[in-house]
UniProtKB/Swiss-Prot annotation:
Transfers the 4'-phosphopantetheine moiety from coenzyme A to a Ser of acyl-carrier-protein. GO terms for biological process: fatty acid biosynthetic process. The lineage of its organism: Bacteria, Pseudomonadati, Pseudomonadota, Alphaproteobacteria, Rickettsiales. Its main location: cytoplasm. It comes from Wolbachia pipientis subsp. Culex pipiens (strain wPip). GO terms for cellular component: cytoplasm. This is Holo-[acyl-carrier-protein] synthase.
Length: 124
């Protein structure tokens, strides 16, 4: 049964501008150490901005699906987006603000200047 759905769209040049202006301060506030480390394999700032924009959208979409937004102590860094060996995106949570009986489905996409994410939370 579906518990909640969430979607978000991010303007990639905005993430590029913010990361250029605030650098590590912005990245460390929003992304996990693992997300930042993985991003270093991309040489281009534009490609890194796409990477970060998709993860930003995924975190926003997740809290929308959860129905709480960023409240009740949830912060961006509590949510980690990673890909499996085949490239399928997954979402991991560092705090217990969702039951382990829930299954989270995540889809990410980008096209030119926009990144999108769609999250479905299901009750097992």
């Amino acid at each position: 049964m579906i518990y909640g759905i969430g979607t978000d769209i991010v303007y990639i040049p905005r993430i590029l501008r913010i990361s250029q202006k605030y650098g590590e301060k912005f990245l460390n506030k929003v992304y996990t150490k693992k997300e930042i480390e993985i991003s270093k394999k991309y040489n281009s700032q534009e490609v890194r901005a796409k990477y970060f924009a998709k993860r930003f959208a995924a975190k926003e979409a997740f809290v929308k699906a959860l129905g709480t937004g960023f409240s009740q102590g949830i912060i961006m860094k509590d949510i980690e987006i990673y890909s499996n060996i085949r490239g399928k995106p997954h979402l991991a949570i560092t705090k217990d603000f969702i039951s382990k009986d829930y299954k989270i489905h995540l889809s990410l996409s980008d096209d030119q200047d926009y990144a999108t994410a769609f999250v479905v939370i299901c009750v097992e």
